[in-house]
């Protein structure tokens, strides 16, 4: 559909996240797509393309929906903390909306993830298009992600997010939630992590102890601060 809509202006399309890392579950995962176009699109073109990508027009197999960003080649190489985007969605109403000059602070983390683990749907390797994000910047970004999880996500997600951040800080690798927890268990993480991992593998709801979660997250955050 993107090739049909953009033609030669479509430079690259990349699948990332759980679907690229082997931990995809349609009941709880979203589908993460990063697309790159040659130049900014006009207002009418953005509106038409956004409508074609919305939930009503493009049913998504993942219950959690679509995480989609369209950026220009210039934005893909932009060292800013929040590079500008052409389109982003889905929002809470299943819409894909134009950026209108706004930036997205999640994009540099997506650049790093896509460069390392993304799957090419269309175009050249992601390393040819997306800027290389230094590891210290990546660690700062996953620290922000962990802080967001503490305030907004379930306790089990906090644990899994902490495991992934810990792994990245040690060896620079991005992992799925499952692989991050397995890595942490192998390195002597508290029993809490093995319990959350077992529930994750079985697709069960997990209700770890709040105090144990807070202590584990704090310990990982301390590791991140000293990197």
Describe each PLM feature range.
Residues 20, 75, 164-167:
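Short, solvent-exposed loop/turn segments at secondary-structure junctions
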Residues 1, 48-52, 215, 219:
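Long, highly charged amphipathic alpha-helices
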Residues 105-227:
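Conserved nucleotidyltransferase catalytic core and NTase-mimicking acidic/glycine-rich helix/loop elements
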Residues 15-52, 65-70:
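Catalytic metal-binding acidic patch
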Residues 51-152:
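Conserved NTP/Mg2+-binding pocket subregion across the NTase superfamily
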Residues 3-5, 21-26, 58:
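Short secondary-structure boundary/capping segments within folded domains
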Residues 1-14, 44-46, 227:
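Helical scaffold of the NTase/Pol beta-like nucleotidyltransferase catalytic core
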């Amino acid at each position: 559909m993107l090739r049909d809509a953009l033609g030669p202006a479509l430079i690259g399309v990349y699948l990332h996240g759980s679907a690229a890392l082997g931990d995809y579950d349609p009941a709880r995962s979203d589908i993460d797509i990063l697309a790159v176009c040659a130049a900014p699109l006009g207002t009418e073109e953005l509106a038409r393309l956004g409508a074609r990508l919305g939930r009503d027009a493009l049913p998504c197999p993942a219950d959690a929906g679509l995480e989609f960003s369209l950026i220009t080649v210039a934005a893909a190489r932009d060292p800013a903390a929040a590079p500008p985007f052409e389109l982003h969605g889905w929002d809470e109403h299943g819409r894909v909306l134009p950026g209108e000059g706004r930036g997205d602070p999640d994009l540099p983390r997506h650049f790093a993830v896509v460069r390392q683990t993304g799957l090419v749907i269309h175009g050249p390797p992601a390393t040819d298009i997306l800027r290389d994000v230094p590891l210290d910047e990546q660690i700062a970004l996953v620290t922000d992600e962990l802080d967001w999880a503490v305030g907004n996500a379930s306790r089990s997600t906090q644990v899994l997010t902490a495991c992934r951040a810990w792994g990245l800080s040690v060896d620079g690798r991005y992992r799925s939630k499952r692989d991050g927890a397995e890595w942490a268990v192998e390195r002597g993480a508290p029993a809490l992590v093995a319990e959350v991992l077992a529930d994750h593998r079985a697709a069960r709801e997990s209700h770890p102890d709040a105090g144990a979660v807070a202590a584990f997250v704090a310990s990982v955050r301390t590791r991140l601060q000293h990197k």
